[in-house]
């Protein structure tokens, strides 16, 4: 299929190639005894031995047990044992006394229809073997799913006499059939076979539509792609789906009165059948044949291939100008269509598959064979060669020039083709791969060796073992021959009008059927729900031309990736470059998969997924290595595990963080590593600026790229405009509220909304840690967990808290709702769903996003009413504004990214403030309940140790309050911090624990540690010192004292936990405690990075580079970046190295989990930094939307994966 001589009916292996290298081919010899040494065969059957044979490699005997065929490479002397041959499913055509290996169509290997249904025992045996193969391939052998699937198949066979393959099983089976094809030289690409499932086909008309789409996809404007379309399986008591043509594209052969043939003599019979069925021939040498297609129990029907589908290449020679005048041509796509596909005992008589040509198939076989076009002598005469004697080697010279012309012409036309030297070299690599992976590879030497240059290719010198595995492709009798099956008789000729109408109907169906069967999987990983919302929008867009499904990453089985066609990923990045919580299992499984370009003998390069995700950069030598290999790869290289996957990724994040979109970058990188094909460069949306606009531009580009790749969809841009238009997004008449009998229970409601386990803690105390003279507040919140197992934690972990909105804000918003339900009435939103043919009828369906609750409860506990509305929501509000001016202003804000971002940045308005700015906007209750984002949990570092405070969780929280509009706007409050500060003992707090395994003290207490945390960045370190204090006092340990670097404004106002730290230092927890004061009277401003540089430079270098110690940094993004840069400079200075080298050292420290960061979001003092980042993002986004830069471009200096 990469090269089709293997299985296509272009009969006749090269003459005289039985040779000694075919030993072990006969199935009757079996694997029980080793193949005899070639030296014992008659000398006339042996290739000449090399003059200087290299010594044989040491023999590695297979495990004790049955003897396996011994296979030698006579060129290099290596010897292997083919253990896979013991799994052969079928005897070959040979007998103990006769070798029939050179027969083209051995009768024993033909798939003939059985007179009756297959015996259930035989079918079950084959089915079990295949199901076992499938589950072994996905590493689920013996699992509950495996056993359950076997039981399902057994029950189905018992009830119906047959069974149906799942789609993933069909994909696996079709790829394995190609992998097992012993006559195919191009199998190294078996993993890249694109499988189209056409088992729902019901008529010859539908068959033709599927086939047209197959040709269009596989041809791909000359950049050929291997593909197979599988039609319904053979069923007892019913005729077969059959394609009468041996290939989808063939040239006609017209028998002349003198017995000669004009055109291709191999196709005379099918040409005459087409004429009998109404085709009007053209009588040319290269007329493309129509297709004869047959549905079960119906006569065959004739279909003309639309000319625009068939790509042909006129043949010319690079130096022989007269060659073009010969008028030769050949088609681009070799697509075998008359072979039977067998998978697990099921037979698919119609399963056309295609790849690309090896040049000798055209130049030597099709054009030069005497029983084909037979142009050899004509070319030799034109070359002035002496054709009177064979000793002039005129045949060889002419054949070479014809092959040169074929290669030159295909390359000139930019049509995929491979020469026989490259193809056979790739087959040797495939043999090596298969020997490692499966212990052998079935191969028919007589078909693998090309028809010219035999001993000049490496396969000539390679012994091979031929045997037959399942799944497999098998030959089958022509449908019009032998005992005629029902419906194969010749019917009346069709008129030209009837044929033309059939073509017209088929052309109109093209694309529709393709869209129905090209499935797309859209995966999202989300912390706040925004990635999920984007994924759902992407699903609506792709529904225009594909069959998409939208799944959360934690709902997806990663092994399915190997059988996917198209995957789109939309994901956020959490905290310090980590996956969102619902993406962690996906990330771990993705890292465990193996790929073709990332194997490494060095174990240190197999990093944990979080560490590697945070370390991936273009400067990583491992990444650079496989990217170089990927760029240099071709159709003669092996495909990765995801060889048939096309993918694209969009990441959400903030450029204020040092690991901007790190998880999305890593998924994008990893999918390519595993062999997937990227349709579009990574898209990135910055929450500081234009995130929604960036997503919409990327989504449109991704949709257009996918449509072009799979040859579906007509107007991608129009579809995207339709999907993202405000008129389509929300319609008042499609939503209503329905009264519900049951009221809200808060904890189950939060579990429903956030799709995670929640627990209820209670307040023990809330204490202000700052001086009463301070204008700010930092509180210590003590929670009582009641000993709940779900709230167990380790120091360094995070706690997620679900706060409510302020009651005053909720009441003010309720007063603006135009049609509020009764204040105490629980309601649910219902949406009017359109009916679909064969699906449920139109009707009202409940929106599952929120549990039944009152409108006040929804606005209080579940919906975000304080964040600035998105452009999408502003577009909806513009359609509800009564004043034209307000409508225009809202529309302008929603459409102009820069204007929106400036408005949002200056005002940071809540929803209520937007309504005050645009008072004519009507506010339906269903709009609030369906379009407002969810109120997200707030995360805090745990500030305690369970050993010191069992049953408690402590939080250190800065209470946030600020004014917008340069300090002149309304006062805004932190949702969670303000709520926590107002709680009383006994008040409930819904919460949960999120582990942070990469931010924990080392298990070895003797390793030195440096802790850096200004302000509330000291929070996790309080748990650290409490744990160490417990180890000292309760376990008698003597850990190496740690160093703490703390920062605050003023020693008299906000020096948090000063007394606790002094006590811990006195007890041996800390060796040094250093504090930086940024607002201390009569002292210069000092920050934690200044302390590191001036007082701890030598210690930082010693701890990190000489003593294998650890450094922990906790704080906001600006501080963390400054500390990182300072540490880099310290290592460069103290270690006498270049700055770039120091950056690499920090990368290694991260990989070794010795440089730890716990970074939280933007604070008020980061405005200068974020303003600069927003300016960069604006420039980048505008250039992306103009197409001036790729979606993955980063402005200079913004490589957030490098220190």
Curated annotation (Swiss-Prot):
A lipid is attached at residues 15, 26 (S-palmitoyl cysteine). It is linked to Variation Asp-298 in NOS3 may be associated with susceptibility to coronary spasm. Keywords: Calcium, Calmodulin-binding, Cell membrane, Cytoplasm, Cytoskeleton, FAD, Flavoprotein, FMN, Golgi apparatus, Heme, Iron, Lipoprotein, Membrane, Metal-binding, Myristate, NADP, Oxidoreductase, Palmitate, Phosphoprotein, Zinc. NADP(+) binds at residues 776, 1016, 1049, 1078-1079, 1085, 1087, 1089. FMN binds at residues 526-528, 530, 572-573, 654, 661, 687, 691. Platelets, placenta, liver and kidney. The modification Phosphothreonine is found at residues 33, 495, 1175. A lipid is attached at residue 2 (N-myristoyl glycine). Its main location: membrane. (6R)-L-erythro-5,6,7,8-tetrahydrobiopterin binds at residues 102, 365, 446-447, 460. Homodimer. Interacts with NOSIP and NOSTRIN. Interacts with HSP90AB1. Forms a complex with ASL, ASS1 and SLC7A1; the complex regulates cell-autonomous L-arginine synthesis and citrulline recycling while channeling extracellular L-arginine to nitric oxide synthesis pathway. Its cofactor is heme b; FAD; FMN; (6R)-L-erythro-5,6,7,8-tetrahydrobiopterin. Residues 491-510 are annotated as: Calmodulin-binding. It is found in: Cell membrane; Membrane, Caveola; Cytoplasm, Cytoskeleton; Golgi apparatus. Stimulated by calcium/calmodulin. Inhibited by NOSIP and NOSTRIN. Residues 15-27 have a biased composition (Gly residues). InterPro entries: CysJ-like_FAD-binding, FAD-bd_FR_type, Flavdoxin-like, Flavodoxin/NO_synth, Flavoprot_Pyr_Nucl_cyt_Rdtase, Flavoprotein-like_sf, FNR_nucleotide-bd, NADPH_Cyt_P450_Rdtase_alpha. It is an enzyme of class 1 (oxidoreductase). Binds 1 FAD. Binds 1 FMN. Residues 1-71 are annotated as: Disordered. This is Nitric oxide synthase 3. Residues 33-66 have a biased composition (Pro residues). Produces nitric oxide (NO) which is implicated in vascular smooth muscle relaxation through a cGMP-mediated signal transduction pathway. NO mediates vascular endothelial growth factor (VEGF)-induced angiogenesis in coronary vessels and promotes blood clotting through the activation of platelets.
């Amino acid at each position: 299929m990469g090269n089709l001589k293997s299985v296509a009916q272009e009969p006749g292996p090269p003459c005289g190639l039985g040779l000694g290298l075919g030993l072990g081919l006969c199935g009757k010899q079996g694997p029980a005894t080793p193949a005899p040494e070639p030296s014992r065969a008659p000398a006339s059957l042996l290739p000449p031995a090399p003059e200087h044979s290299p010594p044989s490699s040491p023999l590695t005997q297979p495990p004790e047990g049955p003897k396996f065929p011994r296979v030698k490479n006579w060129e290099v002397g290596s010897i292997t044992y083919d253990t896979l041959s013991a799994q052969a499913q079928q005897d070959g055509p040979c007998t103990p006394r006769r070798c029939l290996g050179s027969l083209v169509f051995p009768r024993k290997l033909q798939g003939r229809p059985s007179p009756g249904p297959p015996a259930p025992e035989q079918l079950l045996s084959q089915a079990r073997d295949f199901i076992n193969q499938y589950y072994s391939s996905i590493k689920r052998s013996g699992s509950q799913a495996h056993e359950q699937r076997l039981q399902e198949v057994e029950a189905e066979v018992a009830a119906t006499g047959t069974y149906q393959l799942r789609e993933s099983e069909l994909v696996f089976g079709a790829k394995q059939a190609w992998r097992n094809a012993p006559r195919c030289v191009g199998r190294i690409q078996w993993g890249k076979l694109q499988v189209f499932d056409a088992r729902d086909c019901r008529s010859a008309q539908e068959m033709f539509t599927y086939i047209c789409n197959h040709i269009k996809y596989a041809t791909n404007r000359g950049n050929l792609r291997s593909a197979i379309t599988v039609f319904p399986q053979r069923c007892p008591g019913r005729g077969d789906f059959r394609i009468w043509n041996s290939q989808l594209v063939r040239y006609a052969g017209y028998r002349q009165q003198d017995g000669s043939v004009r055109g291709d003599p191999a196709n005379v019979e099918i040409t005459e059948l087409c004429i009998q069925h109404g085709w009007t021939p053209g009588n040319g040498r290269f007329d493309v044949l129509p297709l004869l297609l047959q549905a079960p129990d119906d006569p065959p029907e004739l279909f003309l291939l639309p000319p625009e589908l068939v790509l042909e290449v006129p043949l010319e020679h690079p130096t022989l100008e007269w060659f073009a005048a010969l008028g030769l041509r050949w088609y681009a796509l070799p697509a075998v269509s008359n072979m039977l596909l067998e998978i697990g005992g099921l037979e698919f008589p119609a399963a056309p598959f295609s790849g690309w040509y090896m040049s000798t198939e055209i130049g030597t076989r099709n054009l030069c064979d005497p029983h084909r076009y037979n142009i050899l002598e004509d070319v030799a005469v034109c070359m002035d060669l002496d054709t009177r004697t064979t000793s002039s080697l005129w045949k060889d010279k002419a054949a070479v020039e014809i092959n040169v012309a074929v290669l030159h012409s295909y390359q000139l036309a930019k049509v995929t083709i491979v020469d026989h030297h490259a193809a056979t070299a790739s087959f040797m690599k495939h043999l090596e791969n298969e020997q490692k992976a499966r212990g052998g590879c079935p191969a028919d030497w007589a078909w693998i060796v090309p028809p010219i240059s035999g001993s000049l290719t490496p396969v000539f010198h390679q012994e091979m073992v031929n045997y037959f595995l399942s799944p497999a492709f098998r030959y089958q009798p022509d449908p019009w021959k032998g005992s005629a099956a029902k419906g194969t008789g010749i019917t009346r000729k069709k008129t030209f009008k009837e044929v033309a109408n059939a073509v017209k109907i088929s052309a109109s169906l093209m694309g529709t059927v393709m869209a129905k069967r090209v499935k797309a999987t859209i995966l999202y990983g989300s912390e706040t729900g925004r990635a999920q919302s984007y994924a759902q929008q992407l699903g609506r867009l792709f529904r225009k031309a594909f069959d998409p499904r939208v799944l959360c990453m934690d709902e997806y089985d990663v092994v399915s990736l190997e059988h996917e066609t198209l995957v789109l990923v939309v994901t956020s990045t959490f905290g310090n470059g980590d996956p969102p919580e619902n993406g962690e299992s996906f990330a771990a499984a993705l890292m465990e998969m193996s790929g073709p370009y990332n194997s490494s003998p060095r174990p240190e390069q197999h990093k944990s997924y979080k560490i590697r995700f945070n370390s991936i950069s273009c400067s990583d030598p491992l990444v650079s290595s496989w990217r170089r290999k990927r760029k240099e790869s071709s159709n003669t290289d092996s495909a990765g595990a995801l060889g048939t996957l096309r993918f694209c990724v969009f990441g959400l994040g903030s450029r204020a963080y040092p690991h901007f979109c790190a998880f999305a970058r890593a998924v994008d990188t990893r999918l390519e590593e595993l062999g997937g094909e990227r349709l579009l460069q990574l898209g990135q949306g910055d929450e500081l600026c234009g995130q929604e606009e960036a997503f919409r531009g990327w989504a449109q580009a991704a949709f257009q790229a996918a449509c072009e790749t799979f040859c579906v969809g007509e107007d991608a841009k129009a579809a995207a405009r339709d999907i993202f238009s405000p008129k389509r997004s929300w319609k008042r008449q499609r939503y209503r509220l329905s009264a519900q009998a049951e009221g809200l229970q808060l904890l189950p409601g939060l579990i429903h909304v956030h799709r995670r386990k929640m627990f209820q803690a209670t307040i023990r105390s809330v204490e202000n840690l700052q001086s009463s003279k301070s204008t700010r507040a930092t509180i210590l919140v003590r929670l009582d967990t009641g000993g709940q197992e779900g709230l167990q934690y380790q120091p360094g972990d995070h706690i997620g808290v679900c706060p409510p909105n302020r009651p005053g804000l909720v009441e003010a918003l309720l007063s603006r709702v135009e049609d509020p339900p009764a204040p105490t009435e629980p309601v649910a939103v219902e949406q009017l769903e359109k009916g679909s043919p064969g699906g449920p009828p139109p009707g009202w369906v409940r929106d599952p996003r929120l549990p039944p609750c009152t409108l006040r409860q929804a606005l209080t506990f579940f919906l975000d009413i304080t964040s600035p509305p998105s452009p999408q929501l502003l577009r909806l509000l513009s359609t509800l504004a009564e004043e034209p001016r307000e409508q225009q202003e809202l529309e302008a804000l929603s459409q102009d990214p820069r204007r929106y971002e400036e408005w949002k940045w200056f005002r940071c308005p809540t929803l209520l403030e937007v309504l005050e700015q645009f008072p004519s906007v009507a506010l339906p209750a269903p709009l609030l309940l369906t379009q407002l984002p969810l109120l997200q949990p707030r995360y805090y570092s745990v500030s305690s140790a369970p050993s010191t405070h069992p049953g408690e969780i402590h939080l250190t929280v800065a209470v946030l309050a600020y004014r917008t509009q340069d300090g002149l706007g309304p006062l805004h409050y932190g949702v969670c911090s303000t709520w926590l500060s107002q709680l009383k003992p006994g008040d409930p707090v819904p919460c949960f624990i999120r582990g942070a395994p990469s931010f924990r003290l080392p298990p070895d207490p003797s390793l030195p540690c440096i802790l850096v945390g200004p302000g509330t960045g000291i929070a996790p370190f309080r748990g650290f010192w409490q744990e160490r204090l417990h180890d000292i006092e309760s376990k008698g340990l003597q850990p190496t004292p740690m160093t703490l670097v703390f920062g605050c404004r003023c020693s008299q106002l906000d020096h948090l936990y000063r007394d606790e730290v002094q006590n811990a230092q006195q007890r041996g927890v800390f060796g040094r405690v250093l504090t930086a004061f940024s607002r201390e009277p009569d002292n210069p401003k000092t920050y934690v990075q200044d302390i590191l540089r001036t007082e701890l430079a030598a210690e930082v270098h010693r701890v990190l580079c000489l003593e294998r110690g650890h450094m922990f940094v906790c704080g906001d993004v600006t501080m963390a970046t400054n500390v990182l840069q300072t540490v880099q400079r310290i290592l460069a200075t103290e270690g006498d190295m270049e700055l770039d080298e120091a950056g690499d050292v920090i990368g290694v420290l991260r990989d070794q989990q010795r440089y730890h960061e716990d970074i939280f979001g933007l604070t008020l003092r980061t405005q200068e930094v974020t303003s600069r980042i927003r300016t960069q993002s604006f420039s980048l986004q505008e250039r992306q939307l103009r197409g001036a830069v790729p979606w993955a471009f980063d402005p200079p200096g913004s490589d957030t994966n490098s220190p």
